[in-house]
Amino acid sequence: MAKVLVLYYSSYGHLEVMAKAIAEGAREAGASVDIKRVPETVPLEIAKGAHFKLDQDAPVAKVEDLADYDAIIVGAPTRFGRMASQMAAFFDAAGGLWARGALHGKVAGAFTSTATQHGGQETTLFSIITNMLHFGTTIVGLDYGHAGQMTLDEITGGSPYGATTIAGGDGSRQPSENELTGARYQGRKIAETAIKLHG
């Protein structure tokens, strides 16, 4: 059975919700799925003052965990058009995995959230995807089999490069059903690819 890791960072819970939807899709495909988050690097008092969601269920990942999976689906919110520093710091600590080729041939994908519709979703996805390509993974995006990313009757996330959500400038907007459907779809497609490649 293919093993899938959904690895995410979320300050306010939007990507926690998306991670759970991605995991649902991967499980529907028949994969064994774990959800983990990267360590918070913001000092606790500052995180509390900024009202970060600190009670997230997912255990904190260790860099070495990545080698145990057939597929790794990575989610991080945008920070000025690139992945949040918490996720970047996690990857920066993974040089040992890169040096020994521990992730070569694994399947990977990316998902993100932004404050606005044009707030850097695709550049953030590319910042994650670039890292995963350097680690030797095979990238699976959100193909147009998820027709919801073509809709024009609502403001919605979704890109061929990965599932996305729009949080709103004050973080009050939660992932829509269309965005969650896209996340489940991408999770399923990545798991199906991992099953084909790794059994």
Swiss-Prot record:
Class of this enzyme: oxidoreductase
Membrane-crossing segments per the record: none
Keyword annotations from UniProtKB, A to Z: Flavoprotein, FMN, NAD, NADP, Nucleotide-binding, Oxidoreductase
Reaction catalysed by this enzyme: a quinone + NADH + H(+) = a quinol + NAD(+); a quinone + NADPH + H(+) = a quinol + NADP(+)
MF GO annotations: flavin adenine dinucleotide binding; FMN binding; NAD binding; NADH:ubiquinone reductase (non-electrogenic) activity; NADP binding; NADPH dehydrogenase (quinone) activity
Highest taxon listed in the record's lineage: Bacteria
Presence of the UniProt keyword NAD in the record: yes
Cofactor binding note: Binds 1 FMN per monomer.
Cofactor: FMN
Annotated binding of FMN, by residue: 10-15, 78-80, 113-119, 134
Flavodoxin-like domain span: 4-190
Any Gene Ontology CC annotation: membrane
Binding-site positions, NAD(+): 12
InterPro entries on file: Flavodoxin/NO_synth, Flavoprotein-like_sf, Flavoprotein_WrbA-like, FMN_Rdtase-like_dom, NQO
Sites where the protein binds substrate: 98
Record EC number: 1.6.5.2
Matching SUPFAM superfamilies: Flavoproteins
One Pfam family per UniProt: FMN_red
Keyword Oxidoreductase on entry: yes
Family the entry assigns: Belongs to the WrbA family.
PANTHER family associated with the record: FLAVODOXIN-RELATED PROTEIN WRBA-RELATED (PTHR30546), FLAVOPROTEIN-LIKE PROTEIN YCP4-RELATED (PTHR30546:SF23)
Protein name: NAD(P)H dehydrogenase (quinone)
UniProt lineage: Bacteria, Pseudomonadati, Pseudomonadota, Alphaproteobacteria, Caulobacterales
